[in-house]
Amino acid sequence: MMEVESSYSDFISCDRTGRRNAVPDIQGDSEAVSVRKLAGDMGELALEGAEGQVEGSAPDKEAGNQPQSSDGTTSS
């Protein structure tokens, strides 16, 4: 019973008492990346070619989305 009590007191004295499953702290790695840096990195992303792909593939999607009957022909 002493083992349970010592581990309980260790847990109560740590700063993770409110977390479910009491996972280890991983704050060290996440502190290195700030929200401002992440927003800047996302702002640098480019969507090259996305506009041409959407315009070029629209007729193909319309033709491919027609329902087929059980004999394999497309219905009008």
Swiss-Prot record:
Protein name in the entry: cAMP-dependent protein kinase inhibitor gamma
GO biological process: negative regulation of protein import into nucleus; negative regulation of transcription by RNA polymerase II
Protein family per UniProt: Belongs to the PKI family.
Tissues of expression: Ubiquitous.
Keyword annotations of the record: Protein kinase inhibitor
Biased composition (Polar residues): 1-10, 65-76
Origin organism lineage: Eukaryota, Metazoa, Chordata, Craniata, Vertebrata
Function description: Extremely potent competitive inhibitor of cAMP-dependent protein kinase activity, this protein interacts with the catalytic subunit of the enzyme after the cAMP-induced dissociation of its regulatory chains.
GO terms assigned for molecular function: cAMP-dependent protein kinase inhibitor activity
PANTHER family membership: CAMP-DEPENDENT PROTEIN KINASE INHIBITOR/PKI (PTHR15416)
Gene that this sequence comes from: PKIG
Keyword Plastid set for record: no
Stretch list, region Disordered: 1-25, 44-76
GO cellular component: cytoplasm; nucleus
Source organism, top-level taxon: Eukaryota
